[in-house]
Each structure stands twice: as structure tokens, then as C-alpha cells.
Regions:
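Non-transmembrane, aqueous-exposed alpha-helical and coiled segments at domain scale
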Residues: 1-203
Length: 203
């Protein structure tokens, strides 16, 4: 199947979202393949302006399916805010019909945001994107496909919560990530987005 790929030159703010918005009526799918919610594009519908950070800008095209792809690090809480804003404007719930989250995409958890907030040297956005990609590279990050299995494995839950707490202590933070914290977050993600999580590669 032929595809059109829109790539940025280097630093962002090049108008990729606008280009995709104009191209999407010609296509059945809009796929974002990497990145996190440090990105952003603005959608203006009538007198209403929406700021999107994760959902592809093909969103206003009704026939266009939307994919958050394998290479993304996704903050589920930010995603919910974007979806709620769209529902309030249009009455549509794309996550129930045409929004698909790759099961291989990585999850940004509150731990990642906390850890990121301590980095004053690089000057990050503090949204947990760097730490989430670090966990992905080190093969200790949680993908959407992993959530159900982790919830059914008390040993894994304990190991993950201890690792996160240890990493926070190493950068001078006293917050503890308990098993209960982790379980609550993962159960909410699974309950909220189970209809959208899918093996998006074959699509």
C-alpha cells in the first residue's frame, strides 16, 4: 500500500501537523511512528482551538483511522485529556472506533515525570519522555502489551516498584513508588484504553 511520509528537518515547529491535516483527506490512515507529548499541533475548528500533543492531526478527518505507533512513548493521562477535549467539541469518541494504540508503544508513568523533573542540566520539558525512552533502550520499560501480564505477576510488580523507587532516590527524590501506586496506574490504563490497544503493524 503506498504511503506518504512527513518528516521534520531537525528541531520541530516546521508545520508537519498542518501538512498532515491537509493531506489526511486523501488517506485512510494517519500514523505517528515515534515521539511523545513534547510535540504539539494546533487544530482550529470554528471558534475553538485544540492543542494536541499525541493524537495525529488527521483527527478532524472523519474517515481517517489514527495510529499511535510502535516507536512512541505515550502518556495515557495526557491522551485522555486530548480525547476528552475532542469529545466535548464533537461528541465523538475515536478511541472506541478509529484510534489504535500500538501494543509495542511504551507507557509514560508518573515515575518518569518525577525523574525527569530533576534534570536541570539538559533543560527537558519535564514530561518524562527521556526517561521513558531510556527504559525502552534498557529493556525495562513497560509497553502497552505488557500491562496485563505485569498485573498478574506480583513478583514483577514488586521488582518494578523497587527499581523505580531506587532510581528516584539516586537523584535525590524521597518519593516511593509502591506496588499499590503502580497497580492503580496500570489498571486504570488498561481499563481506559483496552478497546484501543492493538497489534498495529499488520494494519
Amino acid at each position: 500500500m503506498p504511503a506518504t511520509v512527513v518528516l521534520g528537518a531537525q528541531w520541530g515547529d516546521e508545520g508537519k501537523g498542518k501538512a498532515i491535516d491537509q493531506l489526511s483527506p486523501r488517506f485512510g490512515w494517519t500514523v505517528r511512528f515515534q515521539g511523545g507529548n513534547n510535540a504539539g499541533h494546533t487544530i482550529v475548528i470554528g471558534d475553538t482551538t485544540l492543542k494536541l500533543h499525541q493524537i495525529p492531526s488527521g483527527l478532524p478527518t472523519p474517515h481517517c483511522n489514527l495510529v499511535l505507533g510502535d516507536g512512541m512513548v505515550i502518556d495515557p493521562w495526557v491522551l485522555e485529556k486530548e480525547l476528552d477535549s475532542w469529545w466535548e467539541l464533537t461528541g465523538e469518541r475515536p478511541e472506541e472506533s478509529r484510534l489504535f494504540i500500538s501494543e509495542r508503544a511504551s507507557v509514560i508513568l508518573p515515575f518518569h515525570r518525577m525523574y525527569d523533573s530533576t534534570d536541570k542540566v539538559v533543560g527537558t520539558t519535564g514530561r518524562g519522555i527521556g526517561p521513558a525512552y531510556r527504559d525502552r533502550i534498557e529493556r525495562v520499560g513497560i509497553r502497552f502489551a505488557d500491562i496485563e501480564g505485569i498485573l498478574g505477576n506480583p513478583g514483577a510488580m514488586l521488582e518494578i516498584s523497587k527499581r523505580m523507587t531506587s532510581q528516584l532516590l539516586s537523584v535525590g527524590m524521597s518519593e516511593e513508588i509502591t506496588v499499590a501506586n503502580l497497580e492503580g496506574d496500570l489498571r486504570w490504563i488498561l481499563d481506559r484504553f483496552s478497546k484501543s490497544i492493538a497489534p498495529t503493524g499488520p494494519m
